[in-house]
Amino acid sequence: MNIPTLDDLNFSNSKVLVRIDINSPVDSKTGKLLDDSRIKAHVETIRELVSRGNGVVLVSHQGRPGDNDFTDLEEHSRLLQKHLDMEVEFVGDVMGPYARERIRNMKLGSVLLLDNVRFVSEELIEASPLQHSRSFLVRRLQPLFQGYVNDAFATAHRSQASLVGFPLVLRSSAGRVMEKEVSALAKVFNEGEEPKVFIMGGGKVLDSLRIIENLVKRRLADRILTGGLIAELFAVAKGLDLGKDNLQVLEKAGVLSLVPRARKLLLSGAPVEIPVDFKVEKGGQVYEEPANKVTAVIKDVGSTTVGIYSSFIRDAKIIVMRGPMGVIEDERFRESSRTLLKNSLESPGYLIVGGGHMISLLGGIGPLDSSKVHVSTGGGALLLFLAGERLPALEALDISAREVLKK
Ligand SMILES: Nc1ncnc2c1ncn2[C@@H]1O[C@H](COP(=O)(O)OP(=O)(O)O)[C@@H](O)[C@H]1O
Ligand SMILES: O=C(OP(=O)(O)O)[C@H](O)COP(=O)(O)O
């Protein structure tokens, strides 16, 4: 693939639309952002574009409709302003008359943040770059810009309008985050030794299952240590009775229908490990139970599991960690993810850690040795990239290089 970078396009004194990913963990009680790592990550790209006299218009999503973390981007704009140390105008609109008026009238050298792009229904459709290039989002915004930059590595696995539509109609390049992630990950992973251990948790069960299927098919993982909801799915697939409450959680997440796929993976001999115990909560009380005797709602993996997983980590040459083991928004269920992260950092292997929730746990850990760890902004995108899948956002930039830049 031929992905143009900012060095290739050299945007200057232009209006540039920049797709970033500042989707961040949200405290479900207060609605406040719990971490600003992804916001900080984009500062370099934005500063560089501003320093070349460009008017920078930022577009991002936050959460998914119906979820607790589906919010507007006002708080994000304040944090971005703090990290950039310059004014960021928050526009509470994405593509309507107000947004277009603010973009038309903005000064070169200034920064403007549009609202959550998933407020626009077209953004929620997975479609081809060509289809998205004809969306209202692209048709309304494209005439206001001379260029498009995609810096949203963490969403590069989605084929959504703001990611794949613009490269077909604007001169486009990758931003610095996108560029660095792609080159660092390809190098580390391809040149890395075995065993490769993947630690996978979190709430996005369908994504995780797809990734595990890919890893298994390509024989890229020596061990896959599961936590979070994906561990519960595999536990059910293995025939463990997790009780009515936990089945309800899986049903509510719409993932029970994935049990046969998980079962097929287990039967095919996939190296998937499931927890031997869990931390559960009942009536405000927290305690540990063996995986075959669960009587309450699972909130984290148990301490025996952490011990076993840690022994696999110690022997690994490459450790990839994505998605927390438990409901880390609650301090009582943060410990196992934090311990596994610490043990991974202390082990002799190289660590690649990614995803909004996992990187939020790095905060209290102190300075990291960049020769031993790569912190990725991506979670699902990171793993799909490592598993060798083609990421639609990168493909769209590749098409752009061939079809738009050559014209
Ligand atoms: N056992 C569990 N039950 C319910 N939710 C869980 C469980 N374990 C983890 N989670 C949730 O998973 C979410 C993080 O998952 P995800 O978004 O996939 O990770 P990341 O942002 O790191 O890629 C958190 O909100 C956390 O509360
Ligand atoms: O947080 C993200 O992905 P991740 O949870 O895999 O790290 C990205 O912002 C993508 O969000 P999405 O999975 O709702 O498309």
Curated annotation (Swiss-Prot):
ATP binds at E329, G355, G356, H357, M358. One of its GO terms (cellular component) is cytosol. This is Phosphoglycerate kinase. Signal peptide: none annotated. GO terms for molecular function: ADP binding; ATP binding; phosphoglycerate kinase activity. It catalyses: (2R)-3-phosphoglycerate + ATP = (2R)-3-phospho-glyceroyl phosphate + ADP. Its EC number is 2.7.2.3. It comes from Metallosphaera sedula (strain ATCC 51363 / DSM 5348 / JCM 9185 / NBRC 15509 / TH2). PROSITE patterns: PGLYCERATE_KINASE.
